Amino acid sequence: MLMKIKTSIHPSSVVEEGAQIGEGVRIGPFCHISADAVIGDGVELVSHVSVMGATTIGASTKVYPMATLGAPPQNTKHKGGRTTLVIGANCTIREGVTMHVGTDTSRGETTVGDNGNFLAYAHIAHDCVVGKNATFANGATLGGHCEIGDNVYIGGLSAVHQFVRVGDNAFLGGCSAFVGDVIPYAIAVGNRASLRGLNIIGLKRAGLPRSEIYLLRKAYRTIFDRSRTVGENIEFAKAEFASSPTAMKIIDFISSRGKRHYAVPSLKGGDGDDTDDED
């Protein structure tokens, strides 16, 4: 019979009355947990962690020293209403990471998906939505209202402008500034960032069939053919690649335009790249 691990709270830590603490939670020295916090089963707060406001931390997430989760948004329009931060299960949140709650003038919640890996000093601003399996390298920063898809990698010391969208499986290089939306499956880098092809290595590691990668490369060339407008290319691509789910994901992403323009290929970019997708 499996033994349940007891919850342990270091005597130097403060857990406000009303906080919901799951089973098998370990709260190390000098942590502070707010009354509105929900800490899932098996969470570990190593030490010196602040969990503020209405913050939920999913099961088996580990948070390292000096991380601050659920602080008020850095937004002058916020009136102080109750807003939330929801962090998924099995995340790793390293030293000095900051994640803020949403604003009461927008969606009111900041959401982080399961299995995220957020390295030291990464920042997720108010009202952002971050998908599953995200990796933020050291110092990667999101402005408010960003939408980040699943399996996205953001390189160290890179900044993503507010309201920017990043599609699934995109690879964002380090020391870069992203002011336009980045399509799914793309590599983007630079200040200001441009597309440098497709994240071919990442797609292979994800198990995408060679035939689908071929169609995706062909669709990429079609969409960004400089002899026509992007709008014309999209209409052509909708008919040409209707049978390819991955190509249609790019087409749908561009068709559902957000508040920002799109990052487009660099003149030096190709239709694929050998850039690795790990730190």
Curated annotation (Swiss-Prot):
GO biological process, any: lipid A biosynthetic process
The enzyme's E.C. designation: 2.3.1.129
GO terms for cellular component: cytoplasm; membrane
InterPro entries reported in the protein's UniProt record: Acetyltransf_C, Acetyltransf_C_sf, Hexapep, Lipid_A_LpxA, Trimer_LpxA-like_sf
Places the protein is found: Cytoplasm
UniProt keywords, alphabetically: Acyltransferase, Cytoplasm, Lipid A biosynthesis, Lipid biosynthesis, Lipid metabolism, Repeat, Transferase
Gene3D superfamilies registered for this protein in UniProt: Hexapeptide repeat proteins, Udp N-acetylglucosamine O-acyltransferase, C-terminal domain
GO molecular-function terms, A-Z: acyl-[acyl-carrier-protein]-UDP-N-acetylglucosamine O-acyltransferase activity
Record-stated family: Belongs to the transferase hexapeptide repeat family. LpxA subfamily.
Quaternary structure and partners: Homotrimer.
Official protein name in the record: Acyl-[acyl-carrier-protein]--UDP-N-acetylglucosamine O-acyltransferase
Organism: Mesorhizobium japonicum (strain LMG 29417 / CECT 9101 / MAFF 303099)
